[in-house]
Structures are given as C-alpha cells and as structure tokens.
Curated annotation (Swiss-Prot):
Catalytic activity: Hydrolysis of proteins with broad specificity. Generally favors hydrophobic residues in P1 and P1', but also accepts Lys in P1, which leads to activation of trypsinogen. Does not clot milk
EC number: 3.4.23.18
Keywords annotated in UniProt: Aspartyl protease, Disulfide bond, Glycoprotein, Hydrolase, Protease, Secreted, Signal, Virulence, Zymogen
Cited function: Secreted aspartic endopeptidase that allows assimilation of proteinaceous substrates. Can catalyze hydrolysis of the major structural proteins of basement membrane, elastin, collagen, and laminin. Thought to play a significant role in virulence.
Positions bearing carbohydrate: N159, N270
Protein name: Aspartic endopeptidase PEP1
CDD domains: Aspergillopepsin_like
SUPFAM superfamilies linked: Acid proteases (SSF50630)
Organism: Trichophyton verrucosum (strain HKI 0517)
Enzyme class, first EC level, given as a word: hydrolase
Signal peptide extent: 1-20
Gene coding for it: PEP1
Membrane spanning residue stretches: none
GO annotation, biological process: proteolysis
Lineage, highest ranks first: Eukaryota, Fungi, Dikarya, Ascomycota, Pezizomycotina
Top-level division of the source organism's lineage: Eukaryota
Length: 403
C-alpha cells in the first residue's frame, strides 16, 4: 500500500510499466462473490486503522490503541465474509478484490506452516518463474504486515487467463492475517502504478488481461449483507436501474479518484449542503475529491461532514476507547446522499451501522482525519449502495442505482 509521501517516487516509475493496450477483444466474464463463514470477528477499529494507514494518513492514538488492544471474538452464525475465487497457478484461492491497491499477493507453500494453517495455498511449480531479486512488503495501520518474493504464473478468473502474471508469494504474514481464515490474499485492481514490487513494479491482473476484454472496463455490484459480483469486459444492464452517470477519474496517483459536488443528510429541502472547509481535505471550492476503494470497508470523510451526520443520530459520540464514532444499536440512522455529476447516490442509513462493539455499534462513516493532503475514501459502505462501472477509457467511473 502506497503512502502519500511515496507518490512522487511511484509516479517516477510509472513510465517503466508495460500495460496491455486497450485494443478490443472478445472476452467477458462474471465473477460472483462467495460467502465464507468467519472464524473470528475483529474490532472495527482494525478496519479503520488499516484504511487510514493504507492512504498514508496518521492513525490517531485512540484508533491505534483500540485496534491493537482488541481481541478477535467468536462470530455469530450470521457473520460471513465475501470473497472471490481466483485460480492462481494450479489452485483456487479466495481473494479480496481491491480497487485501492495494485498488488496480487497470496498465502503460499512458502508461508510458514504456523501462519498458513487453514488457508488455501498457492504452490509454485516448475512452470512458475521466480523473479530473482524481486520482493514486496506491506504494512497496515494496525501493524499487520506481509511480505515475500515474486513469481510469474498463470492467473485465471472466469474464461480469461493471464499467462504471465506477477504473483506475490507471502514468506511471512503477521498474526492478524494468519488468523483471518476467510481470505487467502488480495488482488489489486487499481492502476498499476500502485504496485509495490521492488525493484520494478508489475502490472495488475486487470491491466495484464485488458486487451483480451470486449470492453476495457469492469463493474461491481457489491451487496449489503449478501454476496455481490464483479463483471469484466461488459456492462450487465440487468444489474442497474436508470442511466449510468459517469464522471472523470483522476488517476494521477494510481487510484480511482473522482469528485463529489455536494452531500445531503436525511431528507427535506433543508438537508442539502456543499462540501466546504479547509483545503487539507482536498476541497476545491464547493467540491471534494475522493477515492473509490473496494478494499476499504468504511466510508471516511472530513471531520465537519462526519460531525454533522452524527449530530442527527441520537446518542452518537466519538468514543476514544472504541476508536471512532459509535451510537446505540437501535438508533435511527439518516440516509447519506452524494451528488456526483448531477447524480444523487444514496447510502441507506442502515448501511451506516457497521458492527456491534459491546453495548454500542460502530459507525460505517468515520473521520478521514486532519493531516495535510489526505484523500476522502468512498469504501464499501458507499459502494454497496451503487452499481459501479470502472472504465479505463477516459478514464471514468460510473454510478447507477442497483436493480
């Protein structure tokens, strides 16, 4: 994961990447998510800390303390995690698809047995090509980490195969990853400039197979409380209602960045507000820049917007012990609407109830912080409310209500 301070270096190596040109192919495929029972449920501050660190933001001490001090709990029968099955080499792995990163890293037979137990493993064979002298390492805000070496191997999703895809094999993972048995790694779907392999970044799976696809795009239909799906190379119009509203993407830092002009909380004629405030939140006049990221669970916005939202939630407070905004679990939560190129994207209030922590519930909307130059993050809490098109032509991103 790339920090803000590293962006200059990342952009410098961008020109060394060889990305498949978006010439028209014929392939299209659907990838349904699958539900995997969770073996442990972490404190939501863990997800919050990872998101902040992922984008180079300072992790407040209260958030860090809550994340480090938490103990995984036994899940209920309804606790599930949604992953995507990907064939890596000779085996199938359950991976998280992450539009906020450019790495494809996996548990493997190189991962120590005490760290890989319970995971599906990538097994390099004689057909796998090790990239001598290449390595990768990632550290998250809750101090979870992973690292290892790099192979070129076949990676397949649906009917599309990348015959020489960089696969980052984990030779070490922290306890946080080892204990998360639901996932066997991560597949990054950002622009390839964010790939962290050294000494030379590698292309993402999407960029590798781009010329095979009918259209140079993918879509996601993530769901609240149930598995969603990804479609590559085409737009399934049965999955959305109404027209798709497109807006330009700023990929200068490797992310799927876009601009929202305004927001509203709840309903009524007096509920609409423009994004405003200090430039340290990326505001340009009445607009605000954000990043669409399937790899971030929460939605992270500026302090003033977050505070205004929770003023309308009875009993809500920024709890230092829990590391974020919490509220009574039976509290009525207002809808949150973003205006994007004239389209109103509505996040239902129920999506803002992320997870119970003791006698209260942790909010799906949290503060992005106040460090200079930090981006706003539109994570799964937002994305699960929309049908989203990620189009490399432009590039642009599109939104529509889910059917």
């Amino acid at each position: 994961m790339v920090q803000i301070s590293q962006i200059g270096a990342v952009l410098a190596v961008c020109s060394t990447l060889t990305v498949a040109a978006p010439t028209k192919g014929k392939a299209r495929f659907n990838v349904p998510q699958v539900a995997v029972p969770m073996k442990a449920v972490h404190h939501p501050a863990v997800a919050y800390a990872r998101a902040l660190h992922k984008f180079g933001m300072k992790v407040p001490k209260a958030v860090s303390d809550a994340a480090r001090g938490s103990v995984p709990t036994t899940p209920t029968k309804d606790d599930e995690q949604y992953v995507t099955q990907v064939t890596v080499g000779q085996g199938k792995l359950n991976l998280d698809l992450d539009t906020g990163s450019g790495d494809l890293w996996v548990f493997s037979t190189e991962t120590p047995k005490d760290q890989s137990q319970g995971h599906n493993l990538y097994m390099p064979t004689s057909k796998s090509k090790r990239l001598d002298g290449y390595s990768w390492e990632i550290t998250y805000g809750d101090m979870s980490s992973a690292g290892g070496d790099v192979f070129l191997d076949t990676v397949s999703i649906g009917n599309v195969t990348a015959s020489s895809q960089a696969v980052e094999s984990a030779k070490k993972v922290s306890d946080q990853f080892a204990k998360d048995k639901a996932t066997d790694g991560l597949m990054g779907l950002s622009f390839s400039v964010l790939n962290t392999v050294q000494p030379k970044p590698q292309t993402t799976f999407f960029d590798t197979v781009l010329k095979q696809l009918e259209k140079p795009l993918f879509t996601c239909t993530l769901k609240h409380g149930q598995p969603g799906s990804y479609d590559f190379g085409y737009i399934d119009d049965s999955k959305h209602s109404g027209e798709i509203a497109y807006t330009n993407v700023d990929n200068s830092q490797g992310w799927w960045g876009f601009t929202a002009e305004s927001y509203s909380i709840g309903g009524g004629s007096n509920s609409t507000h423009s994004f405003h405030g200090a430039q340290h939140h990326g505001a340009r006049g009445s607009s605000i820049d954000g990043i669409a990221d399937t790899g971030t669970t929460l939605m992270l916005l500026s302090d003033d917007v977050v505070q205004e939202y929770y003023k309308q939630v009875q009993g809500a407070k920024n709890d230092q012990q829990q590391g974020g905004w919490v509220f009574p679990c039976d509290a009525k939560l207002p809808d949150f609407t973003l205006s994007i190129s004239g389209y109103n994207a509505v996040v239902p209030g129920k999506f803002m109830n992320y997870q119970a922590v003791g006698s209260v519930c942790f909010g799906g909307l949290q503060s992005v912080g106040s460090s200079g130059g930090v981006p706003n993050i539109f994570g799964d809490v937002f994305l699960k409310s929309q049908f989203v098109v990620w189009d490399t032509e432009g590039p642009r991103i599109g939104f529509a209500p889910q059917a």
